[in-house]
Amino acid sequence: MARVKLIVNRDDVALKDHALFEELAALRGRISGPSTIVLHSPGLARPWNEISEFLHRHSIVEPEYAELAVCATARERDCGYIWNAHVPLARKAGVSVATIDTVRDRRPTAGLSASETSVITYVRQLIQNNRVESDVFTQLLQGHTPQWLVELTVWIGRYQALAGILNAFEVTPTMLAEELPAVPRAATAAAPVRAPLGAPRVTPITRRDQVQERHRAIFDTVAEGRGSVRGPFGILMHSPLLCRRHLDVGTFLRFNSGLEADSRELAIIATAREKDCPYIWAAHAPTARQAGLSAAIVSAVRDRGDLAGLPSVERDIVDYTRQLAQQNAVGAALFDRLQGRHGVPWLVELTCLIGHYGIVASVLNAFEVAPAPDAEPLPLGTTRKGT
């Protein structure tokens, strides 16, 4: 049973949001899944939904590979809802039963096609290691454009974000057709997390003349808000229409949500830590201090330190981020404290913020975008070795 009321009927939202409800319901015939949670924050619901609509309607990633990536992400994030919803779509797109079983059971990919192996390995490495090795990245890029691989990466990041919502709020399928069993990962030695490579794996888009005329308004919007196009946007601009939708979500979460500045920045740096993303850390650790977070809090996040000595508000936000990343679940006591302290819309926005910056980290980590050499460093430790 879900931890909060699911918004499934028009009367579940305020009168002023009825039109929004009907607009979103018309897209799929009903409100279901993550939307039943995200609609607790109506201002976020439309931009949040538009990323999924773009991916499903306009992405150049072939359905076979998109759905395989989604199923592999559901497996890595232990999300039964996404698995149940997307296994039938994967079969319809041409993914074989043997391939789906390999993903479900966490088996080695021996015997699968080279393309299937590359997609599954890409998902596993990106989620388990927060890095993708060069041979896997290169094999996927061969025969495809940077736009294709950017969009595949966002498919993975997006469904990690959706899994975070569904797992945290304990949303389960109404009708279970495809069960996702608990399957432990094979025991492997912890592997060191390497620093980003010296240069991005594709040429970032940082100049207006790199963009087709019809998409230059999107480039201009990014540049006006940040002074230049850099970091994740230099990669996302390989898919300009997707970049615009990503920008809209980030703008709401950073400037229009109910999250306080210190809570928002704390969740962002905690996500950067869990994702081993030096770029996000360098960009937001100074902002976190400016928002009022103490040096002790920032250090505890950076060093994966004990949270016992932190104030309860900050401790719970960091713990929530850690549990989602490490356990694919959130303990009931922690969830109840956050909901009781802040309310459901706030908690929805926090969860979406963590997911949004998870997408950013996926793009930065996969495409090897490093911060400036003199930026504040993020020490890197060890992680599982995804294969």
What are these regions (language model features)?
Residues 1-387:
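Hydrophobic alpha-helical segments
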